[in-house]
Structure formats: structure tokens, C-alpha cells
């Protein structure tokens, strides 16, 4: 199991039956693959859909694409609307959770996930609205950058997407929650010890009294 799959499997355990959820592009889209059988969520997309499903080549519709431009479907009872209504849903607090990738998260619950200096980017898209309007903001990302440096920092160095909005960070090493303004280490991945997490995390954090091993979705792993 690779790092991204582990992260997606853990985040899948965080969603609840009946939730309206927005999944960012990249790693977050994998979360739906690992939802427990008793959890049914409704996917919302910034470009005007409620009730997105996976792409079905037998019932393809060129008008159905998600916010990342990827082909998709829409479930029975799903709805379509313009972007103004879509963002009204988001800004109005009707999205239960959003799952986004991250470039940096710091100990003050700040998120940077849209710009890398020196690279051309189109802008942050709907992420700015999602992190402000969603009831819970979950960041799924690898713990360290390709250079080996920590992505969980004392202070973000990249331009921020949002300030003090992150509720939870899931990496291949650990799960952190922001509780009363403090970064709290709640879980460790299997075969990962506390010292490893400390060595790979720049941010200051406290260890939860109930610090435990991460539990992940077993969907597809059953023999």
C-alpha cells in the first residue's frame, strides 16, 4: 500500500453517512474508493453538481465533468446548477466536509496549497471558498516534500489559501487535529513511532492522551 492510498483510506473513515462532501483534485478523489459500505455521501462540485458519481463509459455524457475537468457521472436524484448557486451552497455552510491536498500546513491551522514560486498556476480556484464555508476542512498530504523537508511547519512559507481554517491533517505517518488552537497528534500510522513523527515534523505539537494507532478503511483488503 502506497502513501497516498493509506492517506485516502484513513480519511474515508472520517466521513459520515449522509454527508455532503467536496473532494479536491488529486489525492482527495481517491477517498470515495474506500468508503465503508454503510457510508453513503453526496459529492458536491464547484462547477455546479450535487450527486457526482464515477465515470460510466456505457452512459457517457460529455457535459458531465468535475471541477478538475475529469469525466464523471451523476446519480439518480442528483442536480445541476450554475456556479453562483454552487458557491452559495459552499459559502452558506451546507458542505459538511471538504478534503483538499496541501503543500504546507502550519501549527496555527493555516493552509498553503495553491502556488509554488516559479511555476505558472491559474489561481486557487474554489479552495478559498471551501476552506471558509465547509463545516470541516481535512487536508490529505504526504508528510514531507520531495526534498525531505517537513510540510507541517511552524509557519507557512508559501502564500496562504486560508488562515486558521484547517481542522485535521492526515499524512502517511500521522493524524493531527487542531483542538482549541493547538496542533494535537492523535494517531500514528502502523509501524511508525513517535520519534519518527517528531523528527519529520517542524511544527510544535502536543501528543494526545489517547494517542493511538491509525485505523484505516479495510474496503478491498478483505480476503
UniProtKB/Swiss-Prot annotation:
Reactions listed under catalytic activity: an acyl-CoA + acetate = a carboxylate + acetyl-CoA; acetoacetate + acetyl-CoA = acetoacetyl-CoA + acetate
EC class name: transferase
One Pfam family of this chain: CoA_trans
Gene3D superfamilies the UniProt entry points to: Glutaconate Coenzyme A-transferase (3.40.1080.10)
Pathway assignment: Lipid metabolism; short-chain fatty acid metabolism
Coiled-coil spans in chain: none
EC number: 2.8.3.8
Keywords, alphabetical: Fatty acid metabolism, Lipid metabolism, Transferase
GO MF annotation terms: acetate CoA-transferase activity
BP term (GO), one: short-chain fatty acid metabolic process
Active site, UniProt feature: 46
Keyword Lipid metabolism among record annotations: yes
Keyword hit for Transferase: yes
Sequence similarity: Belongs to the 3-oxoacid CoA-transferase subunit B family.
Function: Coenzyme A transferase which is involved in short-chain fatty acid degradation and catalyzes the activation of short-chain fatty acids to their respective CoA thiolesters.
PANTHER family: KETOACID-COENZYME A TRANSFERASE, SUCCINYL-COA:3-KETOACID COENZYME A TRANSFERASE SUBUNIT B-RELATED
Subunit structure: Heterotetramer composed of two alpha subunits (AtoD) and two beta subunits (AtoA).
Official protein name in the record: Acetate CoA-transferase subunit beta
Originating organism: Haemophilus influenzae (strain ATCC 51907 / DSM 11121 / KW20 / Rd)
